[in-house]
Amino acid sequence: MTAETLRPPPPAPAPATPGPRRRRRQPWRRALRRDWQLYSLAVLPLLFFLVFRYLPMIGNVIAFRRFSPGGSVFGEYWVGLRYFRLFLADPTFWQVFTNTLVLGTLTLLFCFPLPIVLALLLNEVRARRLKRFVQSVSYLPHFLSIVIVAAMVMQLLSMDGSVNQVVRGIGGEAVPFLQQPGWFRAIYVSSEVWQTVGWGTILYLAALTTIDENLYEAARIDGANRWRQTWHVTLPGIRPTMVTLLILNIGTFMAVGFEKILLLYNPLTYPTADVISTYLFRLGFESSNFSYAAAIGLFEAVIGLILVLGANTISRRTVGTSLW
C-alpha cells in the first residue's frame, strides 16, 4: 500500500457566500424608460377614455335606484331590479330590441364583407391612376359628417328629390321613401355602406401589402389560378385583419348608428327604425325617465359585452386569431 493511497482527500472548498442580490428590472419599466416619449402620446387618449367613458359608468347605479332631476346624483333610494322587470315586460322595448338586431345584422352582413371584396378587386388593378381614383372616391365619404350624409339622403329621397324625379320620368308616381317604414332599413344600410366601405377597403389594402410575394410565386408554380391564389394565399394572409375588424364590428352591433337614425327617422317609421339608442334618448331627455333609460342602457351594454367575448372566444378556437 503506497503513501498516496493513505493520503486523506483534500477538504471541500467552502461555499461561496452569496453577494447582495441584484434586483432585476421589470421589462415594462425598462421599456417605459427607453420609450417614454412614445408612451407619453397615449396620456391624452387614456385620460379621455377615463373621464368620458369609464368614470360615467359609476352613474349606472341609478338603474337600481330611484333618480329624480335635481336630487342626488346617485338616486334617492334603492329599488333593486324594478326597472329591469318593467322594460322586460314592455312590448315597446321588444320592438326596438328586434329593430336593433335586424339593423345590426344587416349592417354587419353588408358593411363587413364588401370592403374585403373591393380590396381584392383593387389589388388586381394594375393601372395606378385608376386604382388611386377609385380609392379616393370610395373613402372620401368616410370624412363627411353624419349630419351632411343624412341631409344628402333626405334631399335625394324627398318628394321633389332626384330619385323621385327619375321615378316620375319613367312614368311612375313619387314615393315618400322617408315616411314609409318598409323603406327605412334599405335606406339606412345603403347609406352606411356608401359611407364606410371605402375606409375598410384601405385597411385591407394595407394588410394585402404584407403578404409575401414568394407565396404567390409558389402557388403559380403549383398551377394555381387567380381564384385559388386568392382563396389559399390572399385570404389567409389577411385573416388577422379580418378577425380583428369583425370583432370590432360586433362590439358596435347593439349600438348601430344612433346619430344617423336619429336624423333620418320620424314617428311614421318607428315600427322599423326605432332602436334601443334612440328609444333611450327619448326616455331620458324627452320623458326625463333617467333610471328606466339607464336600466335599458346597462342591459344593452351587457349584451354587447357578451357578443364581443363570444366572438373573440369562437375566433380563437376556430381560426387561432383573436384580440386577446
Please name every model-derived segment:
Residues 23-30:
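Cytosolic juxtamembrane amphipathic/interface segments immediately preceding
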